[in-house]
Swiss-Prot record:
GO terms for biological process: cytoplasmic translation. NCBIfam families: L6_bact (TIGR03654). One of its GO terms (molecular function) is structural constituent of ribosome. This is Large ribosomal subunit protein uL6. Belongs to the universal ribosomal protein uL6 family. Part of the 50S ribosomal subunit. The gene is rplF. Gene3D superfamilies: Ribosomal protein L6, alpha-beta domain (3.90.930.12). GO terms for cellular component: cytosolic large ribosomal subunit. Keywords: Ribonucleoprotein, Ribosomal protein, RNA-binding, rRNA-binding. The keyword Protein biosynthesis does not apply. InterPro entries: Ribosomal_uL6-like, Ribosomal_uL6-like_a/b-dom_sf, Ribosomal_uL6_a/b-dom, Ribosomal_uL6_bac-type, Ribosomal_uL6_CS.
Length: 179
């Protein structure tokens, strides 16, 4: 049984939650998110809280209950505060800039990379080496940051590439040389 799924989700002021069949819509100051809910799970609003209920108790239903609770809690958090991921670029000549809704990256390749940001995602570049990805959908923010990182993953010898700000690169020693 999911312990996470049993906890109610608090609805902050300024956020409205509407349930229609197997679809939940959360509206808040930063925007609106909609998601389909897994069959066998139902949501109930009780005052300023959302309760996640299972139609029948079982191992799979308990797992889905915890999943749905976490997803809806992330939706509520997203429309109130939003989410952000910070990426850092390390390397000589590596830089980034935002042009409209696209991110231009120079990462040591023979060509610049132009990445069109998904709808609902904004990016900000500080000092050409720090990228801040923001949005209200946690899943989309994480996927966008992972896609940007995948253009040049950090390598273990010099640490060049795109990495998350909180990520620690385990460095390797170079060749030992002749003996």
């Amino acid at each position: 049984m999911s312990r996470i799924g049993k906890k109610p989700i608090d609805i902050p002021k300024g956020v409205t939650v509407s349930l229609a069949g197997d679809t939940v819509t959360v509206k808040g100051p930063k925007g609106e998110l909609t998601r389909n809910i897994v069959a066998g799970i139902r949501l109930e609003t009780a005052g300023d809280q959302i309760l996640v209920q299972c139609e029948k108790e079982g191992k799979q239903e308990g797992a889905y209950r915890g999943l749905v609770r976490a997803l809806v809690a992330n939706m509520v958090e997203g429309v109130t505060n939003g989410f952000e991921r910070v990426l850092e670029i390390n390397g000589v000549g590596y830089r980034a800039e935002v042009k409209g809704s696209a991110l231009n990256l120079s990462l040591g390749y023979s060509h610049p990379i132009e990445y069109a940001l998904p709808k609902g995602i904004s990016a900000e570049v500080e000092k050409q080496t720090k990228i801040i990805v923001r949005g209200i959908d946690k899943e989309l923010v994480g996927a966008t940051a992972a896609k940007i990182r995948s253009f040049r993953k950090p390598e273990p010898y010099k640490g060049k590439g795109v990495k998350y700000a909180e990520e620690r690169i385990v460095r390797k020693a170079g060749k030992a040389g002749k003996k």
